[in-house]
Amino acid sequence: MSNFHARREFLRFLAASPLLTQAWGQDAPGVIASAKDAINVMDFEPLARKALPPAHWGYMATGVDDDVTLRMNRQAFEHYQLRARRLVDVSKADLRTEVFGTTWDMPIYVSAVGSQKVFHRDGELATARAAKAKKAVQMLSTATSVPVEEVAKTLGTPPWYQLYMPLTWDETEKLVKRVEAAGCPVLAWTIDLLAGRNTETATRFTRLDNRDCLSCHMHSPKAGANPADNAGKPMLAGLAGTINPPQATWAYVDRLKKMTKMKLVLKGIDTGEDAKLAREQGADGVIVSNHGGRATETGRGTIDVLPEVIDAVGPQFPVFVDGGFRRGSDVYKALAIGAKGVGIGRPYIYGLSSFGQEGVERVLEILRAELSLTMRQCGTPTVASITRASVLKNGARL
């Protein structure tokens, strides 16, 4: 056997090794036969792992460097405990909350994940149909495999739009105007990948694949653009296709804000200092995010960053969070700390990979049910009644 083939076989063994499960997911007692069989959202993970080719699994499931931040996104939830109050009328739970003047049916949204056709043939449209059915807000990636206009039509309302900024302002304006023309109410500029990233574990998984990926990435950032000429085409049609300007500074926030009537949210905030700067520069909100442990190896879970950020900007400034959320009780902890909404990524992609729209719907059902139960168990039957009095960090009040 040649050295190349020996390395290839070793990587195949590595991909299947249960030793890696702790970093990239969690064990389940068995592979479920249908979406309705899922008891918690991670029941979809083993089936998704079997369904996806190595490169696609590696793209979704792994982190950067040694996957420390990826693991901490989960482990950090153990730092927080709940304070349950008793003898409150908990016969019903009301999960509704108001965000930017719009009432959400629940404080859980579908985070942006690119190129969803690599996970299921219907891609973002299956996710949109599920989000519509379960009354969840969807955030669409710049790297979408389906144009924003088509997603908006399927969803029944325009999604939030996650922006990977093109390198020039002319191209940025073309893309932003197209998204605005599609009716998107919120622009979430991702700022945590401007220096690139070291996805070495995912790279090892790609070595297991010999396929040409153009068939499933054809609408990704290779080809957004102006509404008149490019509606319905790939989001970066007519543009150079290069994104994430490394020279971007805080001055970009004001310029981007003046370019659109959409609300501007900065995604990828990891410190209180930057959250405060975002507010001062005119952003309408921030998303505490480390790209699911796939950007910078900070070693900090987003739930641990959240108190610092909210303390820096105050409770009136909208702060959202994503990264590692797998339980309704996880969502509850973020709401208690002060988050306005919580984004989920990998769980719904595992559902999508396993059962398409039905899988995404079931993930949203489970998280909603778990959050509702936690709210009632803790004596806080409305979102507004969830406060820092409901949570401890390492046994102490926040």
Regions found by a protein language model. Give the residues of each.
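Conserved, mostly hydrophobic/aromatic
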Residues: 53, 110, 131, 189, ...
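C-terminal helical cap(s) of enzyme catalytic domains, especially alpha/beta-barrels
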Residues: 302-308, 353-371
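An N-cap/entry alpha-helix motif that binds or orients negatively charged groups
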Residues: 29-101, 208-248, 384-386, 392-398
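Glycine-rich active-site/cofactor-binding loop and its immediate structural neighborhood
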Residues: 104-143
